């Protein structure tokens, strides 16, 4: 029973302070702008500086002090030309500030947890590339993978429930419900398939969705650590967090007192691995196909009956790792069977031994990468480089530096690719797009401008890694082939940037 105390104890870091009063503080909205995931709504109105934005916040706080003035009408933006086309501007400002406020209990809890456990701060583990060495070591020994799309059609009230355990301020929770029900039509478009990862969604909804996912993972991983074969009789322990600990404690009391072990078969599966990325997660295991089907329908019931989310079985795909590719963090990864023939001779007999072993490969999905280059106006839909007319007003050195920065950042991130051919194609597109942009600026042909730049211009597009490796190793066929097929993982990459952000 002692091993479950960490799950049964109530976290003493829960905060009971009133958070609602922080909505009347100007610095909260300044934090919302500086710490926001997206660009703040305060600065989306063209022609207004920080001083004008501060005036908006002061007017908002003054209005909130007045009774019955928190309910905003859509006519406010029409009657007042100061706000332009932004309807419900006040409500969006409050939602940004409120997103910062509700994160306070979670931030304090995280700091308290790190101090209590005295966890070492490892910057290497923060790198996005740190997950790939783990996949290389583990996935080659597994057989099946569940590719699951997390359901996002969630009732608005379900998003509030996980917060009730951490936020004890009833006024803040009521205000949150007010935002969700009063402005959901203006913030979420019901006619489209909306995911909570799109750029247009407010930060508050991103926080609510992430808190909901954390709630699901907390319960799911707890049960996964205790059991891999869960019977239907164990479904009684799935309840919302506010009653979760009481139910778990009662469950284990029944478990130990009544010898419930013959009904619930608990054991740990050391080969079960869980990875989540954006709106999907992977559950890989060494189990059989029948056992993975049990996990599939178990997850469907888990989401439908305990999180009230409609989960279709078709959103879960069971695949063999040797026949399946994972689209993960900008890579397409797979564990392929590689055969190697070994010739062995004993006396006069000659034997051919065929050894088959799994090898984890990561390649760059060239089609999706060219699609990103097309959206950023570096090439057309067929991958043919084009010029960027928006850069013709810049100096030549500035244009070259921008293209070099994009090329080196892409090469640095995709250095883990097992095959570099796709990466070289991307470099070619960026290099020729840079030349066409310069030629368009000076009103010359591409051939004439390439002769003017010379071969030194082409050498600038080599990454630092390629330059260093070319100096260390001799230019032999075997070495170049090994560098071409090898992959390198870096432990200094903490974010994925869009091509437009590289500029």
UniProtKB/Swiss-Prot annotation:
InterPro entries: Domain_X (IPR024937), Maturase_MatK (IPR002866), Maturase_MatK_N (IPR024942). Pfam families: Intron_maturas2, MatK_N. Its main location: plastid. Transmembrane segments: none annotated. GO terms for biological process: mRNA processing; RNA splicing; tRNA processing. GO terms for molecular function: RNA binding. It comes from the Eukaryota. One of its GO terms (cellular component) is chloroplast. The keyword tRNA processing applies. Usually encoded in the trnK tRNA gene intron. Probably assists in splicing its own and other chloroplast group II introns. HAMAP family: MatK. Belongs to the intron maturase 2 family. MatK subfamily. This is Maturase K. It comes from Actinodium cunninghamii. The lineage of its organism: Eukaryota, Viridiplantae, Streptophyta, Embryophyta, Tracheophyta.
């Amino acid at each position: 029973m002692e091993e479950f105390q960490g799950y049964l104890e109530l976290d003493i870091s829960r905060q009971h302070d009133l958070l609602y009063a922080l909505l009347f503080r100007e610095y909260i909205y300044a934090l919302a702008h500086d710490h926001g995931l997206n660009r703040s709504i305060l600065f989306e109105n063209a022609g207004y500086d920080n001083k004008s934005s501060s005036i908006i916040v002061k007017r908002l706080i003054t209005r909130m002090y007045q009774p019955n003035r928190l309910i905003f009408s859509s006519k406010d933006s029409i009657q007042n030309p100061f706000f332009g086309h932004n309807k419900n501007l006040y409500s969006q400002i409050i939602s940004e500030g409120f997103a910062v406020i509700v994160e306070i209990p979670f931030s304090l809890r995280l700091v308290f947890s790190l101090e209590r456990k005295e966890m070492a701060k490892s910057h290497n583990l923060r790198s996005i590339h740190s997950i790939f060495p783990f996949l290389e070591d583990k996935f080659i020994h597994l057989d099946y993978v569940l590719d699951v799309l997390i359901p996002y059609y969630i009732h608005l009230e379900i998003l509030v429930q996980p917060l009730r355990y951490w936020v004890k301020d009833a006024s803040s929770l009521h205000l949150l419900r007010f935002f969700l029900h009063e402005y959901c039509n203006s913030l979420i478009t019901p006619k489209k398939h909306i995911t909570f990862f799109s750029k247009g969604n407010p930060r508050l909804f991103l926080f609510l969705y992430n808190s909901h996912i954390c709630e699901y993972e907390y319960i799911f991983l707890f049960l996964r650590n205790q059991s891999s074969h869960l019977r239907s009789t164990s479904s009684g322990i799935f309840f919302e967090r506010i009653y979760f600990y009481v139910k778990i404690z009662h469950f284990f009391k029944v478990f130990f007192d009544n010898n419930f072990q013959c009904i619930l078969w608990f054991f740990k599966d050391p080969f079960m691995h869980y990875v989540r990325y954006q709106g999907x997660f992977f559950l890989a295991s060494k189990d059989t196909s029948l056992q993975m089907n049990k996990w599939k329908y178990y997850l469907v019931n888990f989401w439908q009956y305990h999180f009230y989310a409609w989960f279709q079985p078709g959103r879960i795909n069971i695949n063999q790792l040797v026949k399946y590719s994972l689209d993960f963090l900008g890579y397409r990864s797979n564990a392929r069977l590689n055969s190697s023939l070994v010739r062995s001779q004993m006396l006069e007999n000659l034997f051919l031994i065929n050894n088959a072993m799994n090898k984890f490969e990561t390649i760059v999905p060239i089609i999706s990468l060219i699609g990103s280059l097309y959206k950023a106006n570096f090439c057309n839909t067929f991958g043919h480089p084009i010029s960027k007319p928006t850069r013709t007003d810049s100096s030549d050195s500035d244009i070259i530096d921008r293209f070099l920065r994009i090329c080196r950042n892409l090469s640095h991130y995709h250095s883990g690719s097992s095959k570099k051919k796709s990466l070289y194609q991307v470099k070619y597109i960026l290099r020729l797009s840079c030349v066409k942009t310069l030629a368009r600026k000076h009103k010359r042909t591409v051939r004439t401008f390439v002769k003017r730049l010379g071969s030194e211009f082409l050498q600038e597009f080599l990454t630092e890694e390629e330059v260093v490796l070319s100096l260390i190793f001799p230019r032999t066929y075997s070495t170049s082939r090994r560098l071409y097929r090898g992959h390198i993982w870096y432990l200094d990459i903490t974010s994925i940037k869009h091509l437009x952000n590289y500029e």
